[in-house]
């Protein structure tokens, strides 16, 4: 299993997280999931400055993103 954001492979006993339903599931490693959770929190609370910082962090982590991840990110967390 690989992370759809950074392309990292699952290690032994490592938990991967998923977002979405059905065929649109996006898988995240724990590090990428942490940034996504922060983006959700920033968006819900209206923190534009933190939202921008976490957007930058997610872009830096996305070294080898899947096309499904890019579509999901643009739909849910546009720049």
Which sequence ranges carry the predicted segments?
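Glycine-centered signal
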Residues: 6-7, 21
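Short Cys/His-rich "knuckle" micro-motifs
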Residues: 13-16, 39-41
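Short Cys/His-centered divalent metal-binding micro-motifs
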Residues: 30-42
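Short, intrinsically disordered terminal segments enriched in charged and Pro/Gly residues
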Residues: 40-79
